[in-house]
Every structure is written in C-alpha cells, then in structure tokens.
Amino acid sequence: MAFADRLLAAWYAGHPALALLRPLEALYRRVVTRKRARFLSGESASYRAPVPVIVVGNITVGGTGKTPMILWLIEHCRQLGLKVGVVSRGYGAKPPQLPWRVQANQCADQAGDEPLLIVQRTGVPLMIDPDRSRAVQALLASEPLDLILCDDGMQHYRLARDLELVLIDAARGLGNGRCLPAGPLREPAERLLDADAVLFNGANADRADGFGFCLQPSALVNLRSGERRALDHFPAGQRLHAVAGIGNPQRFFNTLLGLNWQPVPHPFADHAQFSAQSLAFSPQLPLVMTEKDAVKCRAFAADDWWYLAVEAQPTPAFSAWFDNQLQRLLRKP
C-alpha cells in the first residue's frame, strides 16, 4: 500500500501517531481560516459572474460521489429548460493553453478524466482552468448560459458562488475530524454550517444534518464497442477483476459485491494513469472498472473490459429543495 493510501486509511480509521501532526494542523487551520475571512470581508477580491454559480464540492480528501451528482444536476437543469455550463480545475490535465474548452474527442491527458467523462456523457460546455474565475469568464464569452456548475472549488474563494453543495461519504463521514495533515479535512468541520446543503453519499434517506443520495448501478458498458448490457450480463458469483482509480476505491468494490459478483480488487490512486501492462492481471477474467477510469483505457481495452455506469439518485426532498433554490437564483435581477 502506498504511503498516501496508508495515510488516508489512518485519517478515517484513526491512528495515535497522527497526534504528532497536530502542530502542523493548527498552522494549516489558521491559514485556511484567514484566507476565507479575507474573501468574506472583501479584503481579497473575488469574481462574481453575471449568472448563478453553484459549487459542488467537499471539505474532505477522498471520493464523495461528486461527478455522478454533477451529472444528475446537469440533466435535472436541462429538463427545466436551462442551459448549463461547467468549470473544473482539470486535475492532472495538460492542455495546450488555459483556459481550455474540453471536447468529447480529446484524450484524458489533455482534458482530465473527470471533465472528459462529464463532456462525453452530457455534451455540456466545460472549461478547465485552476483559476475557476477565469474559466467562468471564458465560458460565458463563448456562449450564453443560464447558470454554471463548479466541479469542486469549495476552497477556491476567488470565484464568488450563489449556492454551495457539500458532499460527504456517509460511511466514512469526516474521519477523525481533524484538518490536514492530521486528518482528511480541507477546512474545519464548522465550515459545513455555512454551506447551503450537505449531501451524504450512501444515505438512503435524508438526515437531520443533510440530504441523502445513492449511486445506483444502471448498466455495464463495453470499453471497445460501447455496447450496453444489463447488469445480469454477469451471473451471480461471477469472478472478475475490479479496477478503481478513484478517491474511495472500496466503495466501488462494495458496489460490485452488492451485485453478487466476486471482484478481485485492484485499487489505484485517484486519477491514476493506466496502460495495458498495468492492467494485465492473472488469472484471465472479465475486467470491470469505473467510468472515470474507462475514459483513460479505451485505446488499449480488451474485448472483455467493461465499466459500470452509475447514476446519482438524490432524495425527493433534495430535488424539491434544489428546484426552489433555482427559482430563487434565476429570478434575481
């Protein structure tokens, strides 16, 4: 297990050695708290877009189901007749220039795995740039939009936001509740009090402190042909290699177990790069991966490689709440 994986496990399981990092944690907390205070007071300038900006992010390190939720938000807004754009940092992307408009035919090295997935699934206009405010301005200059979704960027305060949605893994929660590097929190836990909504991935029902949503498997999709198969394509008890280069690989493996398959788990680091050699496992079995990983593997995929398509399913209460927020934001002068 890599050091980063061991550290992540310690943050969520708890480890007495982390107490040695508390002086650094105190320094980190002071820095991030002061940074946010400067933007809230107006001491540091932020860019406010002429259309509503909705930030979808988290305060923890590790996967929380952010990309499936963004896909749900895009589709939901479109059903309401709204034209939506997305901005993202584009983690790991190496575009020729910044800002960079992501197209469906680009490679993940150029566009980033998550932005490419979003564009391939939805065709939404999407701009990547570590400077999200610059990405928003470039996106609005390219075409008219009703609102913008910011993929992550909770801590990017140079971009003013009209709505903040914070996602948390319901099983792992906030780990040991401590900030980096002594814990998984990017900001202190009390930051949640200022968010407009907290959504718990894996909660089948709403909670007193937020809404619930689940990731529902919908189909198997072949990497080479694009063919979609029902989930019963593999019988109960099927052994298969399971690949996950996401923030919380175990959640993916648990999903496969829940489908009554027998996965041989192969966890990789989040945003990992793959090759045919790195995925040449023994014994020879069908291989199932996440959709985020699949966008990086199509060029060398074997015939029996599949990705598991999943859809975010928030509770009806969240859908109603979100519709009310949209009405409020879009009728602002």
From Swiss-Prot:
GO biological process assignments: lipid A biosynthetic process; lipopolysaccharide core region biosynthetic process
GO molecular function: ATP binding; tetraacyldisaccharide 4'-kinase activity
Annotated signal peptide: none
Pfam families named among the record's database cross-references: LpxK
GO cellular component: plasma membrane
Family annotation (SUPFAM superfamilies): P-loop containing nucleoside triphosphate hydrolases (SSF52540)
Sorted UniProt keywords: ATP-binding, Kinase, Lipid A biosynthesis, Lipid biosynthesis, Lipid metabolism, Nucleotide-binding, Transferase
Catalysed reactions, as listed in the record: a lipid A disaccharide + ATP = a lipid IVA + ADP + H(+)
First-level EC class: transferase
The UniProt record lists the keyword Transferase: yes
Record-listed E.C. numbers: 2.7.1.130
Amino acids binding ATP: T60, V61, G62, G63, T64, G65, K66, T67
Pathway connected to this protein: Glycolipid biosynthesis; lipid IV(A) biosynthesis; lipid IV(A) from (3R)-3-hydroxytetradecanoyl-[acyl-carrier-protein] and UDP-N-acetyl-alpha-D-glucosamine: step 6/6
Membership in a protein family: Belongs to the LpxK family.
Database matches in PANTHER family: TETRAACYLDISACCHARIDE 4'-KINASE (PTHR42724), TETRAACYLDISACCHARIDE 4'-KINASE, MITOCHONDRIAL-RELATED (PTHR42724:SF1)
Function statement: Transfers the gamma-phosphate of ATP to the 4'-position of a tetraacyldisaccharide 1-phosphate intermediate (termed DS-1-P) to form tetraacyldisaccharide 1,4'-bis-phosphate (lipid IVA).
Protein name: Tetraacyldisaccharide 4'-kinase
Organism: Pseudomonas putida (strain GB-1)
